[in-house]
A protein has these predicted regions:
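Short, well-ordered beta-strand elements within core beta-sheets of diverse protein domains
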Residues: 88-97, 144-152, 208-212
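PLP-dependent enzyme catalytic core of the Aspartate aminotransferase-like
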Residues: 156, 163, 179-240
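Conserved small-domain helix->loop->beta segment predominantly found in fold-type I
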Residues: 107-175, 179, 192-198
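Active-site beta-loop-alpha junctions enriched in small/polar residues
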Residues: 22-24, 127, 152, 212-214
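FAD-binding core of FAD-dependent oxidoreductases
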Residues: 46-48, 52, 173-181
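Short, solvent-exposed beta-strand edge segments and adjacent coil->beta transition regions
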Residues: 53-55, 142-146, 204-208
């Protein structure tokens, strides 16, 4: 989304703009400089980066608002524990090299997915076909390591693909050093009705990848053997 345009329109009517910047981290996008009033991050994800912390931060541009948020956080007990804070700060030290590895692997996987006959559509802002590509190029310094794609296969083929993966773990989280795959329709967005999922563009064949920092060749090989097994499952169904 165009943060600058949204912020300008919001400020005209006296509204404040809060941006969740979790998927990109402060290294790839700085919403406050684009006009946002508050930026939030799930520190559980890229900032910590090792999937061993649950936490979050809210950063306000206005010092008075920031002071008010601190006051309420203390009153309500919303502050992190000492050890969680230590782990988060320790992870933050390696954010830059981790993000480089995340993005390099993502680029490699995107190139691979575009050659796969079982892949019907790919969603990632680095692709010119993505509706937000130009906005992302303008306001980000990188495109991130979250991507999704739709398989052109049956439910049995999809299940076979997921079961065949060994490096990608089936899980809902994201932003850690390990690679994860999720099936939004039955996991993150399961509470939505089928009609609501369809309206949101969440098909039964949609998969989401959080690309980790393992060796890129190994990740591609893992996906390749998953597609191979899914193809065999498809062929077996056709024989029946």
């Amino acid at each position: 989304v165009d943060i600058t345009a949204i912020a300008a329109a919001s400020h005209e009517v006296g509204a404040q703009v809060v941006v969740d910047n979790t998927f990109l981290s402060p290294l790839l996008q700085q919403p406050l400089s684009l006009g946002a009033d508050v930026v939030v991050h799930s520190t559980t994800k890229y900032i910590n980066g090792h999937s061993d912390v649950v936490g979050g931060v809210a950063i306000a541009k206005d010092p008075a608002l920031a002071e008010s948020l601190v006051w309420w956080a203390n009153c309500l007990g919303l502050t992190s524990g000492a050890f969680d804070s230590y782990l988060t700060l320790r992870g933050l030290r390696t954010l830059a090299p981790r993000l480089r590895a995340h993005q390099e692997n993502t680029d490699r996987i995107l190139a691979f997915l575009q050659q796969q006959p079982l892949v019907k559509k790919i969603y990632h802002p680095s692709l010119p076909s993505h509706p937000g590509h130009e906005i992302a190029r303008r306001q980000q310094s990188g495109f991130g390591a979250m991507l999704s794609f739709e398989l052109d296969c049956s439910e049995a083929g999809l299940r076979t693909f997921l079961a065949a993966l060994t490096l990608f773990s089936v899980a809902e989280s994201l932003g850690g050093v390990e690679s994860l795959v999720a099936h939004p329709a039955s996991m993150t967005h399961r509470a939505m009705t089928p009609a609501a999922q369809q309206a949101a563009g969440i098909s039964a064949q949609l998969l989401r990848l959080s690309v980790g920092i393992e060796h890129g060749e190994d990740l591609v090989a893992d996906l390749a053997q998953g597609f191979e097994q899914a193809q065999l499952a498809q062929q077996a169904e056709q024989v029946k």
